[in-house]
Regions:
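Alpha-helix N-cap/helix-start motif at helix boundaries, enriched for small hydrophobics
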Residues: 32, 44-49, 169
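Short, basic (Lys/Arg/His-rich) helix/loop patches that form interaction surfaces
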Residues: 22-25, 131-171
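Basic, Lys/Arg- and aromatic-enriched nucleic-acid-binding interface segment
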Residues: 10-39, 43
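DNA/chromatin major-groove-contacting recognition/catalytic segments
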Residues: 15, 186-201
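Short, polar N-cap/turn motifs at the start of nucleic acid-interacting alpha helices
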Residues: 54-56, 144, 165-185, 190
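Conserved tyrosine-mediated DNA breakage-rejoining catalytic core shared by Y-recombinases
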Residues: 48-85
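Short, leucine-enriched amphipathic alpha-helices that occur as contiguous helical runs
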Residues: 13, 29-30, 127, 131, ...
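C-terminal catalytic core of Y-nucleophile DNA break-rejoin enzymes
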Residues: 5, 73-93, 109-134
Length: 201
């Protein structure tokens, strides 16, 4: 399988959201993408999310949590990530419409991203479905090397571009060294050249 890349252009991220919003499952697909690029959770962890992971009952009312907490399936490490106000709103807009009955019953033991293709019972979206959703939208946006892992890489890349220290990004991504993180988030020669050319000593 080819190596996927982060989405480095902010306008392309906006275009991805526009493309993902189309169709019967548009709101679900946009939320999957939005949580992915804002938390760095791997696709297996995203798809395993249940309503109880993002919602809580407070004073007999359901509300969105301020952070996500889970044990990563791959590393078995605990991971706690804050949810931005915008992401909290996006989650609430989705669940209050898509899962209105469960919200009314305060029944939070259901998958956030449930598949519609199951024969009885409830299952989350599969990793293959997740891959198709993201990679297909990427092709429509003119992004050829895109997959579900691109969301995690996009998170790291834009933190780096926004001036967040490499050591902190390494910690957020659970990497063993800064060098691995640099390669992972797609810092290439052009980025290094730009950094040096701006020095002007």
């Amino acid at each position: 399988m080819e190596e996927v890349q982060p989405i480095k252009n902010v306008e392309k991220i906006a275009l991805m959201k526009t493309i993902l919003s189309q169709g019967d499952f548009g709101e679900r697909n946009v939320l999957l993408f939005s949580i992915g690029i804002n938390t760095a959770y791997r696709i297996s962890d995203l798809l395993s999310l249940k309503l109880r992971d993002v919602l809580e009952i407070y004073r007999q009312k359901v509300r969105v949590k301020s952070r996500l907490k889970m044990t990563e399936q791959k590393t078995e490490k605990n991971n706690s990530v804050i949810l931005t106000k915008k992401l909290q709103k996006d989650i609430w807009d989705f669940v209050s419409k898509e899962h209105a009955e469960w919200i009314a019953q305060q029944d939070l033991d259901h998958y956030l991203f449930a598949s519609r293709k199951t024969n009885g019972g409830e299952q989350p979206l599969s990793r293959q479905q997740g891959w198709y959703i993201i990679s297909n939208a990427g092709k429509k946006a003119g992004l050829q090397h895109l997959g579900t892992h691109s969301m995690r890489k996009t998170f790291g890349y834009h933190l780096y571009k926004n001036g967040v220290g490499l050591e902190l990004i390494q910690l957020l991504l659970n990497h063993s060294s800064p060098r691995i993180t640099l390669r992972y988030i797609g810092i290439e020669q052009e980025d290094k050249d730009q950094a040096v050319s701006s020095l002007g000593l």
